[in-house]
Design a protein with these regions (language model features):
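A short glycine-threonine-serine/GTX helix/turn-capping micro-motif
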Residues: 149-155
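ATP-dependent carboxylate-amine ligase
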Residues: 53, 128, 154, 163-338
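Phosphate-binding loop of NTP-binding sites
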Residues: 4-137, 142-146, 165-168
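Redox-cofactor binding/interface segments in oxidoreductases and associated redox assembly factors
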Residues: 1-3, 91-92, 110, 227, ...
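A short acidic, often aromatic-flanked loop/helix-cap motif at beta-alpha or helix-coil junctions
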Residues: 29-33, 144-148, 266-267, 294-299
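Nucleotide-sugar-dependent glycosyltransferase donor-binding/catalytic pocket residues
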Residues: 47, 157, 206
Length: 338
């Protein structure tokens, strides 16, 4: 089973082809695995993992015992999977390689559409084609907006909660029971995940996700935040640099700081000529400090622990970011104890 990220020159993939071993894309494999369920597919540029987890939680609380497959780990699940025995399945489906077309769901949610892997116009066309083939309820966040109270912070999460609530009620869940279920939602790993009262970790990696994360923490901590962020790839940074610069220049307050790490290098044939330096040059004076690696980021944060009300690590791909958040939380807790 392979993803689109696996290049044709990958040694394991080449050996599989040489030996005649069948190779299947992960989307096709998951679609087959869920073919016996009434599938609800959750698509969109931002918020898919959170909405998938919210919907799974609501359906479970309403007695449907769904089978769920998410793009992120969920507390209380078996990692990213909830192995329910009911007839309904909920799955996050991926637009980054347009592999969502491998799925044939009964119902669907589209959270939103923005320029990320493709232009907004191309993303809209992909999502329009996807939902056109859905026979059951469709909740499309591009056209229908609302908010519902939910246990996790941020206006974006209240909007996510509304989409999950709408689809759950369309499937027959009692509206009030579904609303109450959102108040006991336990969150998703790496989605403003708290490591103590002053440290958070988030998966944010595009302008929309970073804006949601930053504004949520800024509202909670008006005295200032420090965010450690690593761009997750050279191609995404090249595509989003101008939008990232505009977003950071809009949200970073005088009392805030962005600690900018080098681009995460996952190998392969990427064009590495544009890096974090290019983004840093476009940010307003004093907004950004560049650091060489996670150790340097940790040392900088420790030296400035009293300068900010809260710290956050964020970015995709780099497995070391949650560990940095945990270490920072430990340092701050030790200092608080004296």
């Amino acid at each position: 089973i392979v993803s689109t990220a696996i290049e044709s020159a990958n040694p394991g993939l080449r050996r599989a082809h040489e030996r005649g071993i069948p190779v299947t894309h992960r989307a096709a494999a998951l679609s087959r695995a869920l073919s016996g369920h009434k599938l609800v597919a959750v698509a969109g540029t931002c918020g898919k993992s959170t909405v998938t987890a919210m919907l799974g939680h609501i359906l479970a609380e309403c007695g449907l015992d769904p089978f769920c497959v998410n793009g992120a780990n969920v507390p209380g699940w078996e990692g990213a999977v909830r192995a329910g025995k009911g007839a309904v399945a909920v799955a996050e489906v991926d637009e980054s390689d347009k592999s969502l077309v491998a799925f044939h769901p009964y119902a669907a949610i589209v959270t939103n559409a923005s320029a990320d892997h493709y232009s907004k116009e191309e993303m809209d066309a992909v999502f329009d084609a996807f939902v056109a083939g859905v026979p059951g309820p469709v909740v499309d966040g591009r056209r229908e907006r609302g908010e519902m109270p939910v246990s996790v912070p941020g206006r974006h999460n209240r909007a996510n909660a509304y989409l999950a609530w709408r689809l759950a009620t369309a499937l027959g869940c009692d509206a009030e029971q579904a609303r109450r279920a959102l108040l006991t939602f336990g969150g998703v790993e790496r989605r403003l995940q708290a490591y103590g009262p002053r440290v958070y970790d988030d998966y944010a990696h595009n302008p929309e996700k970073l804006h949601a994360m930053w504004t949520t923490l800024a509202e909670k901590f008006p005295d200032g935040i420090c965010v450690v962020w690593r761009p997750h790839g050279y191609a995404p940074l090249r595509k989003m640099k101008d939008a990232l610069a505009a977003m950071f220049n809009a949200v970073i307050r005088p009392q805030d700081k962005l600690l900018l790490l080098p681009v995460y290098d996952a190998g392969g044939t990427a064009d590495r000529t544009l890096n974090s330096d290019a983004l840093a040059r476009e940010l307003k004076p004093g907004a950004c400090e560049q650091v060489a690696d996670l150790d340097a980021a940790e040392a900088w944060c420790a030296a400035h622990a009293d300068d900010f009300a809260a710290f956050a690590t964020c970015g995709a791909r780099d497995p070391g970011l949650p560990g940095l958040a945990a270490r920072l939380a430990g340092r701050l807790a030790a200092e608080a104890r004296g």
